[in-house]
Curated annotation (Swiss-Prot):
Superkingdom of source: Bacteria
Recorded name of the encoding gene: glgC
Protein name: Glucose-1-phosphate adenylyltransferase
Naturally occurring in which organism (per UniProt): Lacticaseibacillus paracasei (strain ATCC 334 / BCRC 17002 / CCUG 31169 / CIP 107868 / KCTC 3260 / NRRL B-441)
GO molecular function, one term: ATP binding
EC number: 2.7.7.27
Keywords: ATP-binding, Carbohydrate metabolism, Glycogen biosynthesis, Glycogen metabolism, Nucleotide-binding, Nucleotidyltransferase, Transferase
Pathway(s) the chain acts in: Glycan biosynthesis; glycogen biosynthesis
């Protein structure tokens, strides 16, 4: 069995900056945009790019993520001899060990990768919102005769210190890499998307773990080693929509941008669809007291209140007299009567009782956590 390029999705992160939203679930399984979860964008990019084989590396609170992905059928990634495989830490003859970094997670799954005998390994993050053609990136990698290609995104100078920054020459060859520099020399931020020539990467990893120089992380260890040894490493500039939703603020902003019909993400593009695995639910129901403006309300919702510039995910209940404004309400949340929710994110399965208030500010978003209960709500 062989495949030209195998995908490996790093989906084991806790997402600590998302606080209460990831207390019981991994960051890639956090709901987004009404009917999606964050990892849907990476899985859909694989399917749309024609990359039909991928491993999904999980670790932190994987139950919800595993249940969501299942066998990959919702993304068309369930072909015989290909498809999606969930990869979790395991016990071997050398003992049981959790993944200690991004590169270590790949090293621990060499047997899985080798079973497909790939020429190229595509490393992906499972927690970004974007659309990208990985085949176009592979074509670039081949044209450059690269050993490593890193997808990069121009960012504002003040934002650059939050990312790994690539400094390149006039041929786009990477000449220097800085991990979250205090004074960045460039604004080309690593997107955490890499294409490696697998035989070369495998050699680097196995040799490092055979000595005391174990490579645990791509940013801290692998990329610097490639540059030190003059491996042909190139930056692939991506200029589409890309959002790192690793903070409450950025997650809220991305959801609000999702409501803009002119959003460059263009979720309605039938030539590059975003797929998901969703429960079959009845259509939304709006009572006579419901008022909706500039919002997205999906299947299973019951609305008796006012919804203004907000997203209601599947199976959300909004009581009479309640006002939801500039907010994102995650699946199965129940909001009682005469409740005010403004500039907020309400987590999955949360309950806000009658007359409650959850009010934030544009730069200080209020959060109700996963399954959190605030007050009591009368049953409709």
């Amino acid at each position: 069995m062989s495949t030209e390029m195998l995908g490996m999705i790093l989906a084991g992160g806790q997402g600590t900056r998302l606080g209460k939203l990831t207390k019981t679930t991994a960051k890639p399984s956090v709901p987004f945009g009404g009917r999606y979860r964050i990892i849907d964008f990476t899985l859909s990019n694989l399917a749309n790019s024609g990359v039909n084989t991928a491993g999904v590396i999980t670790q932190y609170q994987p139950l919800e993520l595993n249940r969501h992905i299942q066998n990959g059928a919702s993304w068309g990634l369930n072909e015989r001899g290909a498809g999606v495989t969930i990869l979790q830490p395991y016990a071997s003859s050398e003992g049981e060990k959790f993944f200690e970094g991004t590169a270590h997670a790949i090293y621990q799954n060499i047997a899985y990768i080798d079973s497909y005998n790939p020429q190229y390994l595509l490393i992906l993050s499972g927690d970004h919102i974007y659309k990208m053609d990985y085949q176009a990136m592979l074509d670039y990698h081949k044209a450059k005769k690269a050993s490593l290609t890193v997808a990069v995104m121009p960012v504002e100078k003040e934002e650059a210190k939050r990312f790994g920054i690539m400094n390149t020459d006039d041929t786009d060859r990477i000449i220097e890499f800085e991990e979250k520099p205090a004074k960045p020399k460039s604004n080309l931020a690593s997107m955490g998307i890499y294409i490696f020539n697998w035989p070369t990467l495998k050699q680097y990893l196995t040799e490092s773990y055979a000595t005391d120089g174990a490579m645990e992380d791509f940013g801290h260890d692998v990329i610097p080693a490639y540059l030190t040894h003059n491996e042909a490493s190139y930056a692939y500039a991506f200029r589409g929509y890309w959002k790192d939703v690793g903070t409450i603020q950025s997650l809220w902003e991305a959801n609000m941008e999702f409501l803009n019909p002119n959003n460059p993400l263009n979720i309605g593009n039938r030539n590059w669809r975003i797929f998901s695995q969703n429960e079959a639910l009845p259509p939304m129901f709006l009572t006579k007291t419901a008022k909706v403006a500039g919002s997205m309300i999906v299947d299973g919702c019951y609305v008796a209140g006012s919804i203004q510039h907000s997203i209601l995910s599947q199976n959300v209940k909004i009581g009479e007299g309640s006002v939801i404004k500039d907010s994102m309400i995650m699946p199965n949340a129940v909001i009682g009567k005469n409740v005010t929710v403004d500039h907020a994110i309400v987590g999955e399965n949360a309950i806000i009782g009658d007359n409650g208030k959850v009010v934030g500010k544009p730069n200080e978003i209020s959060v109700v956590g996963y399954g959190e209960v605030l007050g009591r709500t009368e049953k409709e």
